[in-house]
Each structure stands twice: as structure tokens, then as C-alpha cells.
Amino acid sequence: MLFAEKNILSVSQLTGLVRNVLEDNFDHVWVEGEVSNLATPGSGHLYFTLKDASAQLRCVMFRASVRALKFKPSDGMGLIARGRLSVFDARGEYQLIVEYLEPKGIGALQLAFIQLKERLAKEGLFSDSHKKDIPRLPQRIGIVTSATGAAIHDILNVLNRRFANVQVLLRPVKVQGEGAAEEIAAAVNDLNRYGSIDVMIVGRGGGSLEDLWAFNEEIVARAIYRSSIPVISAVGHEIDFTISDFVADLRAPTPSAAAEMVIKSKAEISAELEALFHRLGMAVRRLLNEHWGELNGLVRAVKDPSMLLGHLAQRLDDLEGRSWRCIRQLLIRSADTNHFLHDRLRLQNPVLRLERCREQLLLVQSRIEKTMMHTVERAGQSLAFNAGKLQALSPLATMARGYSIVKKLPGGAVVTDRDQLAPGDSLDILLRKGRAICRVECTHD
């Protein structure tokens, strides 16, 4: 009878009662602590312990809630958790079913930004070696932004003011909210597949960190990194920085600034062209001055081509005389040799050997004569050719047709333009024969 009066419960019954008490009274609690024993099995759930100096609490965060996390928890991290208490029947342990997590002392989005930035930097996505140059004068600009936001209007206004002829291709997207990051990444990929785009602007106007968050998503960063088209990131205001700013080829503080940076104004382009024309003119004048200097050098070096021809003819005569002297000496030596051999052979009477030597001697003599004649003929042809070139290049041939060379005194600078002269200047005029000293009365066009 004693035991019959007692209400005896099974372990499962008692555990169920405890669970009901906990779930009814602690269905929405906030708790803070340090993470330990963090586990992430293949199921996608998150298991960890929150502890402080004197106690610990087992926690579980199911896969649906884990997917909403913007950052990655780790052991030793201080966290603030929101959830409900329950009991894990198999071990009889109470635990916190976590529905929301945020880092202690820093916002979840800010921590997620820092973690992703550090990871992508280690992978090299921000490396300067990967940055592409922005074209100096793009013909077609692709824009990824909202079709109804202020950013597209600011960009178009600036482009129309600076260079209205440029073509613009808008790929409209959501720039905030669920699915915005996926749309932005898809738009970047679409413009790369479309082709014929010289440069791309990806951005939006200002807003809170939450509003700009789509441009901090990894999927957007990797799409910009893979883009073969140079990308300018233009998100928010000058003080706003996003992951897309670091991975893009160029960061603009605002969408309007991106339009200013992507193309020069017509006035700037005109100024650059004018500077190029000025440099070209200076280069042409420098070349002309160099050639005039060469002409003056030729005039000083070659006073009269006939004199140079005379020297060359004299040298040719000298060579011809020396050649004939060599031939005569060879013939004399050959004759002496012939007489010597003849005397020796006459003593020995070798008729056949003498005849062969005589034939060889005549052959050598013929070859020597032909060689010398050919040498003299080639020297004469070279002389005639060089004489023709000198005659063609000589300013005297031009002066023989009535032209003259005018030099300004003193100094002897060659005059090619009336702007070099003034009334009263003295001139030295070189004629085909002789020269004349004149004075300038006036100049005309």
C-alpha cells in the first residue's frame, strides 16, 4: 500500500514534463557566451557550447537558420544567441535551440564583411596583377544597376554632358533584398557573353550597410573577378566600401564619379589632340632642320662635282698605269723564266716538257691580261656610276637652271622663308658661277 500511493514516473515521462516546463517558460530567450566544441556535420546543422566562467549550455542551430547566417562562427568567438530551451530526450540534457546569432561587440554583417574580405584577399582576388586597364575612349559602356534608381539617372546625365556619342547598354537588376546578389552576378556574366562591351559600371546609390549588402556577397565578387570586361565598382557614397570595390578593376566613390572616370569630356579629348598635333609639328620642324643642315654640309663639302670626278679619274689612271706595269713585270719575269727553262731544257733536250711549260705560260699570261682588263673595266663603270650620283645630288645642277642659294649675313644661315628677313638685311647669294652680295629692300608673300 505504501508504494501504491506514490506517483512513479518513467524516465521518458519525467523528461517530457521537464521539456514542457522549459519550452513553455523559456520559448524566447537571449543568452551570451563564448563558443566551444563547435561542430558542423554534413547535415548542415550547427552544434556548439556557449560557456562563461562557471557554466555552459549546449546549443544546436538547425540548417534553415544556419543558411541565414552572414558570418561564420568559430571556437573562442563571443556570441549573442536568441532561441528557445528544450530537452534532448536521448541524453536527458537541456539545450538551446538557436534561431539567431550575432557576434558580441560587432554586428553580424560587419563581421561577415571582414571574414569574406580576408578570405578573398588570401585567394588573390584583390591582387593588382589581375586588374585590367580601363580603355581611354570606350565606344560602348555596360551598366549593371536598377532601372528605376537614382544611380542610372546620375550616370546618364554625366555621360550625356561629357560625351553624348557613347553607347550605353543597361542590364537592369535588383540592387537590394533577397535575390539581388544573384541577379547582379548573372548580369555581369550576361554582359560578358553579349560581347562588344568596352567597360562595365556595376553599382547603386547610397544606403545602409544592409541596403548595400548585395555588393558584399561572394557570388558578386567572383563574377566581377571572372569578367573579361574591365569593371568599375560604384556603390553608395564616398565613405562606403564594399567587397566589389576591392575586386573590381577600378573603384569610383559614387555612380556619378564612375561616369566621370569612364570617359573623358570632348574638351579634354580636344586638348589632348591639340597637344599631339603640337608635338607632331615640332617633330616635323626638327626633321626639316636636320635635313637643311645635311644640305649645307653637302654644299660645303662638294663645291664642284667635276673636281671630285677629276680626282677619281686621276686615281683610275694611276690604277691603270700600275696595272700595266704589273703586267709588264709579270711578262718580263715570265720571259726570264721561259729563257731559263729553255736553256735548261735545251741542255737536257726534253721537248715534250718544254712544250707543256710553254702552253701553261701562255695560259697564265692570258688569264692575267683578262683579269686586269676586267678590273679596269669595273673601276671605270663604278666611276661613271658615282659621277652620275654626285651630279644628281649636287645643288650646282639645280643652280645651273637659274636657282641660287641665299644666305643671311653675317652668320651664313640659309634663308628659306621671308619671315627670316627684314629690310636692310645683307644677303650672300651663291650663283652657278660666282656670288653676289645684296641688301633687302622689302619682303612680299
Swiss-Prot record:
Alphabetical list of NCBIfam families matching this protein: xseA
Entry keywords, A to Z: Cytoplasm, Exonuclease, Hydrolase, Nuclease
Tree of life domain: Bacteria
Subunit structure: Heterooligomer composed of large and small subunits.
Example GO molecular function: exodeoxyribonuclease VII activity
Name used for this protein in its record: Exodeoxyribonuclease 7 large subunit
Species: Geotalea daltonii (strain DSM 22248 / JCM 15807 / FRC-32) (Geobacter daltonii)
Reaction catalysed by this enzyme: Exonucleolytic cleavage in either 5'- to 3'- or 3'- to 5'-direction to yield nucleoside 5'-phosphates
Family: Belongs to the XseA family.
Enzyme class (EC, first level): hydrolase
GO cellular component: cytoplasm; exodeoxyribonuclease VII complex
Chain's gene name: xseA
Main function: Bidirectionally degrades single-stranded DNA into large acid-insoluble oligonucleotides, which are then degraded further into small acid-soluble oligonucleotides.
Main localisation: cytoplasm
Subcellular location: Cytoplasm
Enzyme Commission no: 3.1.11.6
Gene Ontology process terms (BP): DNA catabolic process
